Amino acid sequence: MKLTKFEIARILGARSLQISSGAYATIETKCDSSLKIAYEEIKQGKVPLKPIRPVKA
């Protein structure tokens, strides 16, 4: 499933907040910024968040 730019922005913000609050990163990196770590997780496909899209009837 390809993410839209809006879904990426929402997931990036939520994941960055989780990491800055003490959640463990799912990747190994030398970055200190939670935003950069979250972005790398999204690029590698290892972010533990998934968007829920409404089903069209």
Curated annotation (Swiss-Prot):
Any Pfam family: RNA_pol_Rpb6
Reactions performed catalytically: RNA(n) + a ribonucleoside 5'-triphosphate = RNA(n+1) + diphosphate
One Gene Ontology term from the biological process aspect of the record: DNA-templated transcription
GO cellular component labels: cytoplasm; DNA-directed RNA polymerase complex
Top-level taxon of origin: Archaea
The entry's keywords: Cytoplasm, DNA-directed RNA polymerase, Nucleotidyltransferase, Transcription, Transferase
GO MF assignments: DNA binding; DNA-directed RNA polymerase activity
Keyword Transcription tagged: yes
Cell compartments where the protein resides: Cytoplasm
PROSITE patterns from the UniProt entry: RNA_POL_K_14KD
Disulfide bonds: none
Enzyme class: transferase
Entry EC number(s): 2.7.7.6
Subunit and partners: Part of the RNA polymerase complex.
Family the UniProt entry places it in: Belongs to the archaeal Rpo6/eukaryotic RPB6 RNA polymerase subunit family.
Its job: DNA-dependent RNA polymerase (RNAP) catalyzes the transcription of DNA into RNA using the four ribonucleoside triphosphates as substrates.
Protein name: DNA-directed RNA polymerase subunit Rpo6
Organism: Methanocaldococcus jannaschii (strain ATCC 43067 / DSM 2661 / JAL-1 / JCM 10045 / NBRC 100440) (Methanococcus jannaschii)
